[in-house]
Swiss-Prot record:
One annotated GO biological process: leucyl-tRNA aminoacylation
Residues spanned by motif 'HIGH' region: 42-52
Full protein name: Leucine--tRNA ligase
Record's GO cellular component terms: cytosol
MF-aspect GO terms: aminoacyl-tRNA deacylase activity; ATP binding; leucine-tRNA ligase activity
Known catalytic reactions: tRNA(Leu) + L-leucine + ATP = L-leucyl-tRNA(Leu) + AMP + diphosphate
Stored SUPFAM superfamilies: Anticodon-binding domain of a subclass of class I aminoacyl-tRNA synthetases, Nucleotidylyl transferase, ValRS/IleRS/LeuRS editing domain
Amino acid sequence: MESVYNAEAIEKKWQQTWVEMGLDQTPEDNTKPKYYALSMFPYPSGNLHMGHVRNYVITDVIARLKRMQGHRVLHPMGWDAFGLPAENAAIERGIHPAKWTYQNIAQMRQQLQQLGLSIDWSREVTTCSPDYYQWTQWLFLQFFQAGLAYQKEAAVNWDPVDQTVLANEQVDSEGKSWRSGAKVERKMLRQWFLKITDYAEQLLNDLDKLPGWPEKVKLMQANWIGKSIGAYLEFPIVGMDEKIAVFTTRPDTVYGVTYVVLAPEHPLTPKVTTAKNKKAVEKFIKEVTSESEQERTAEDKPKKGILTGGKAINPFNGQEVPILIANYVLYEYGTGAVMGVPAHDIRDFKFAQENKLPIRVVIVPEDQQDQDVTLTQAYTEPGIMVNSGSFDGMDSITGKTAIIDYAEKQGFGKARVQYRLRDWLISRQRYWGCPIPVIHCPSCGTVPVPDEDLPVKLPEDVEFSGRGASPLAKLDSWINVPCPSCGEPAKRETDTMDTFIDSSWYFLRYTDANDQQTAFSLDKVNDWMSVDQYVGGVEHAILHLLYSRFFTKVVRDRGLVDVDEPFQRLLTQGMVQGMTYKNPKTGKYIPSSQVNPEDPKDPETGEPLSVFYEKMSKSKYNGVDPKQVLAKYGADTARMFILFKAPPEKDLEWDDADVEGQFRFLNKVWRIVGEYQSNHKSSSKKKGSLTKVEKDLRRAIHIAIKEITEDLDGEYQFNTAVSELMKLSNALVDAKCYESPVYTEGVQTLLILLAPFAPHIAEELWHTLGHSESVHLQGWPQLDPSALEVDEITLVIQIMGKTRGTIQVPSSATKEELEKFAFESEVAQRHLKDQEVKKVIVVPGKLVNFVVGK
């Protein structure tokens, strides 16, 4: 073997060999238990960053481990390839989105392959390929046929200069367009939705079926779904036949209503506004509706409102209360109206004070019966109902039920469960997305494109100006088609789908990625699903994971898959952070190349810099390019550092010194095998007659097997597993019994245990030992419990609780024998001398403590 570890040569060699061997191909043999390991697939930006590397290396270790443990493993990869960046590239660089995307995919695929990932590339999916989005469209039609896809008017971000719709991420923090700089307006457009609210209860309850998910992620999803149990109440409008419907979780406070608030967009707003208030109300509406939803609902956003002049009637006591509109009430949430109970709601209390609205107490603590108390803050706890008519004196918990019962009997309310979750708006007025496969006919209405006409392909002869309507909406040759139902002239839908649609089912496609006849066959999808281990960033904890769960339940109900949940276990890896230098006075970030780390100062001003770790990003100049790390150290070192530096769920702080440390460790493994090769000679010695050195080494080998297996089979503590590899390497260095079968066992075990972490060097050294079969095809080492047993143990000798020394004793010694060995030892005799031993405390396997008297 070569005397020097050459990572670059070894890694190129084995990556090519593995491809030729088909080592990473998914086996068809279903006699073995299946294991589906999956990383969240990337957007093809063109370059891997360290966050990608961490994600994919974690999954790769799991996939390699499971193969060695006897599973047939599915470990695929693909590309979440539709989206705005490609369309922006078309506008800015004059390159077609498809060309830009596929160039990036080729570049990133090569980078992934250089990491030595054991991916089955024959199952690669690309969401912008017609071969994939044909089935995205087919699945959309499954939703449509089930009544789960529909159109309605909805507010969008509108750029008045470019005359186009903007995604939320294209609107800056000041509510301006990313491109034109114009103040973004809110505009109503007819949009497509998926009825995820029909599955709200299932999505909430089935979180209990996911013990392998982090609790924080399940809590985030539960909060997003936002189940509320309360009442639906109707407030008549003075002088009108119509009523304002509100939802409340505190019906017990209804006698404390002193105003009602409508969303500015509510259809009743213009009707309840008096002529006197019309001008002011319209001005207020224009100001409010120009703001994005994010701006209006921000925690620190002042809650503003204005009187409409209209009044509503509290149906419980007949009192008239003013109707206002306010910026914090959104028409898309709940009923688009709320009842104001300032005495018992923190937000309402502040709003009432600012708008000089009355505050009426209707709940008081049990130990306080004063009904005329003046509040300095809202009382939001349970208590006793007061100022509440016939409900006075009732505890508020009981009062909730009583109020609802009364409202139901009187016909102006009922019990209701409401969810914060809203239906999923999937329309995008963009080009680079999956076309929505419907046709609008003047006679037949909305008609689905027939299955045999799928996919509806994106036209290529389009112009990308970034202004006006979507490029699709301007292309008459593509829009105008005959109606599939009646044959008369009709028009295609010009909206494309939210890219979250593409990523909501890709894990199903991987199970049957090359099927041209269907999205996935029932046999194959049921064979592989659910995903056993899903790995990705916590930033996807809500939307992507929730939408994927929703999709899975819908296709289950359509008879396309048998599972309830897509992902059995979820690992959300922490961020990769880089050393960051920032001038605290100017807020300017300084590239590390311009800073002396021993004395960090601004190179321009000489001012001291703040130094801290922060998520890697270009704008902060704190990123580390994976290509540079691979070029200097190789993929195996990069993998080892990523796995060793921090537990997978924690943030990882990049440290060049620790990278160097892992490189030194792999060089050490290289030397261990080299020295073994140089000094080992065949021996007929049996394991039965082992020396103490051999016994100690064999114990170290099986401790490593035990600890590493537990680390990987449990909570994926890769960092402690790498530590165990280091301990085993130290044991081999110390033992030096090269001709012993135990040493051979140790070297081979080290390489097999190392293989999932550093696959290239493990493979090279395995073959150096004379093996012809891949190290990755070896069975995972099995623990021999007898190897952990020891002949002798170290016994601590204490006098009056103070340690005076240690002795070696047989591990099988009884309590009485331990006392005898301890008393007769030189250590005890020297310290006890002529002292009288009053008591002896024996802790078997650990210590003997002598209590003496004067």
